[in-house]
Every structure is written in C-alpha cells, then in structure tokens.
C-alpha cells in the first residue's frame, strides 16, 4: 500500500520541469560598432544610488517621498546613460576628431536634449564617464619617434613613411560615405542604424565641428536622432545648433554662411592655406600649357626632312641629267615645198 501511494509522488517529481536557468543579460546590439557602454552605465547607477528616507521625512508621507526620489533617480540615471551613448555615437561618426572635440559635441547634445540643469549635468557626467583615457595617436607617436631619433639613425624611409601617412590623412577629408547597419536584437526585432557623416578635417587654427547626422530607428517609440552642424570654432560649441529629438524627421540648420567656392572647399578639406592651393593651381596650368606647346613643336611627324645640295651636285644635275632628252626635230625638210598633186583626168597631151 505504501508503494502504491508513493507512485503518484514519483510521477510528479519526474514530470516536474527543471529549474529555470537565469536569463542572460540583455546584450547591446550596437556594442560592436559603437563600443561597449556597460561600464559607463554601471558608473551612472553607482553615482545615483537608491534614495534613503531621513527620520524627519518618515512622519510626513514616506510613500510619496520615496516615489518622488525614485523617479528623480531614474530620470538622472537615464540621462547619464544617454550621455554614455551620445559620446559613443559622436566618437563613432567622427573617428578622426580629437577626444576634446567629441566631448564638446556630447556636452552640447546634452544641453540641447534636456532643459533642467540637473539632467544636463547628469548627461554630461555620462559623457565624461564614457570618455576613455587619452592615448597617443599612432601618427603623432611615429612623428615623435622620428624627431627624437639621432641624426645618424634618421633614414629616408622613416621620412617617406611619415609623408605618406600625412598625405593619406589629408586625402581622407575628401571621402564622404554613409553607413547603414541592420541589427537583430535578442527578441527578434530588427533595428536600423543609419549614419550620414560629412567629413570635415579639424585643423589647429579655426577648428570646426563636424556635422553629425545620426538616426536611430528602433522598435521603441523613443527613436534617437542627433544633428550637429558646423558652427565655427570649438570655443563656441555651447552655441551649436544640435538637435536630439524623438521624432522621425529633423531639420538641419546652420548659423554661419561658409565660403562655397572651390578654393575655400579645398582649403577646408586639406588644411592648406588658400594661397598655396592657388599657386599650385596656377603652376599646374602653366605646366600643362608648356607641355602642350612643346609637344606641338617637337612632334616628329610635323616636319619634312630636306637634304641640302652643294654647288657641285647642283651643276652635275644640270650638265649630266639622269634622263634622256627628246631629240630635236630635223631641219632637212624645212625648206622644201609641199608636194603638188596633179589631176591626170584633166590633163591633155
């Protein structure tokens, strides 16, 4: 009887599902392209811990106070985490810009995104938390090694490689491309990430911000769009027209009217002064004209070669010609009268 009573219990134990494994943490779909922001988000959560009610607040309305503080903490934490993501987006779009410029763009985006000063400060703290330690750039490190090397060890190969790197970096300013990423999240939804950057080189003098146009169209209604227009020197970044909106369409505005001529565009993209570009263009035109004229003058098919004749050769041609002359007519029959024809029928003998 005891064994019969234990059978249903054994069946229930066998049919019971295994204990559920803990769900894996949600993976950021943009971590591969934009960089990991988990550490920055953890710093934001540690910076704004859960609120603890004081003794004097317990007698008023502890539930209402706790809800208000929890809401404020959630808002500040969200602003800080958004600052982390904004910094990674600005750094992804403007790879060639300096960290200070990326930090300035992120802070300007925070100023435009939030109205309250506390939220702006939290977003800026997220930008600072995501900002990595400044590392020496490979080009600058290579130049420093070349300059610090002794004169005997300085070779032409190092100078040539440095010159090639400078030319390649200058040529990158002419490249303007668009990236589109289609990522699938863990819940099966497809997220489209589009970037339309306008590459602008940041020089030492008159450095200008790059225009960043990022559209984040996800499954959630809060889509992120960042628009940064070229607004002049970096010290005026606070006055930048930067839009962080949740709409599907954003307007791009510009405060300054930049020079649109060819030399200004080339100077802005290459980083060279206008007078150097003008001199190079003028010399190129002169070289092309000189090559065209020299080609026309020295072309081998445009000349006929004549062999000069000496005086003896000229006389030889006149005295002894190579061809036979036509014999002159004979004068034997010149004085004789023409023959006379007689009519024999009319003649009478």
UniProtKB/Swiss-Prot annotation:
Record flagged with keyword Transmembrane helix: yes
Membrane-spanning intervals of the chain: 276-296
Highest taxon above the source species: Eukaryota
Subcellular localization: Golgi apparatus membrane
Positions annotated as glycosylated: 100
Keyword Plastid annotated: no
InterPro entries per record: Uncharacterised_TMEM59
Membrane topology label: Single-pass type I membrane protein
Predominant localisation class: Golgi
Keywords, comma-separated and alphabetical: Glycoprotein, Golgi apparatus, Membrane, Signal, Transmembrane, Transmembrane helix
Motif, Microbody targeting signal: chain positions: 347-349
GO CC annotations, alphabetized: Golgi membrane
Cross-referenced Pfam families: BSMAP (PF12280)
GO biological process: branching involved in ureteric bud morphogenesis
Signal peptide feature range: 1-22
Record-stated family: Belongs to the TMEM59 family.
PANTHER family to which the protein is assigned, alphabetical: TRANSMEMBRANE PROTEIN 59-LIKE (PTHR28652:SF1), TRANSMEMBRANE PROTEIN 59-LIKE PROTEIN (PTHR28652)
Role: Modulates the O-glycosylation and complex N-glycosylation steps occurring during the Golgi maturation of APP. Inhibits APP transport to the cell surface and further shedding.
Protein name: Transmembrane protein 59-like
Native species: Bos taurus (Bovine)
């Amino acid at each position: 009887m005891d064994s019969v009573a234990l059978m249903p219990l054994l069946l229930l134990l066998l049919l019971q599902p295994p204990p559920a494994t803990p769900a894996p943490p949600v993976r950021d779909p943009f971590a591969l392209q934009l960089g990991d922001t988990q550490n920055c988000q953890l710093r934001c959560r540690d910076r704004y811990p859960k609120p603890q009610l004081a003794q004097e607040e317990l007698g008023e309305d502890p539930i209402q106070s706790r809800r208000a503080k929890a809401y404020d903490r959630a808002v500040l934490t969200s602003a800080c985490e958004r600052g982390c993501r904004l910094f990674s987006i600005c750094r992804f779009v403007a790879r060639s810009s300096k960290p200070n410029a990326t930090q300035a763009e992120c802070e300007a985006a925070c100023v435009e995104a939030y109205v309250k000063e506390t939220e702006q400060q939290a977003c800026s703290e997220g930008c600072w938390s995501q900002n990595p330690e400044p590392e020496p750039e490979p080009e600058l490190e290579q130049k420093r090694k070349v300059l610090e090397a002794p004169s005997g060890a300085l070779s032409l190969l190092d100078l040539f490689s440095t010159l090639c790197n400078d030319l390649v970096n200058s040529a990158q300013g002419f490249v303007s491309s668009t990236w589109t990423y289609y990522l699938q999240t863990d819940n099966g939804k497809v997220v489209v990430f589009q970037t339309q950057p306008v590459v602008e080189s940041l020089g030492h003098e008159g450095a200008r911000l790059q225009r960043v146009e990022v559209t984040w169209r996800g499954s959630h209604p809060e889509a992120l769009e960042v628009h940064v227009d070229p607004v002049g020197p970096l010290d005026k970044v606070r006055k930048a027209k930067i839009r962080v909106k949740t709409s599907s369409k954003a307007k791009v505005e510009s405060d300054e009217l930049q020079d649109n001529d060819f030399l200004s565009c080339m100077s802005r993209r290459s980083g060279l002064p206008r007078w150097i570009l003008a001199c190079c263009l003028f010399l190129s035109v002169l070289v092309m004209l000189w090559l065209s004229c020299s080609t026309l003058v020295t072309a081998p098919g445009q000349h006929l070669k004549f062999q000069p004749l000496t005086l003896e050769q000229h006389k030889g041609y006149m005295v002894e010609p190579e061809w036979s002359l036509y014999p002159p007519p004979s004068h034997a029959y010149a004085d004789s009268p023409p023959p006379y024809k007689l009519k024999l029928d009319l003649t009478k003998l």
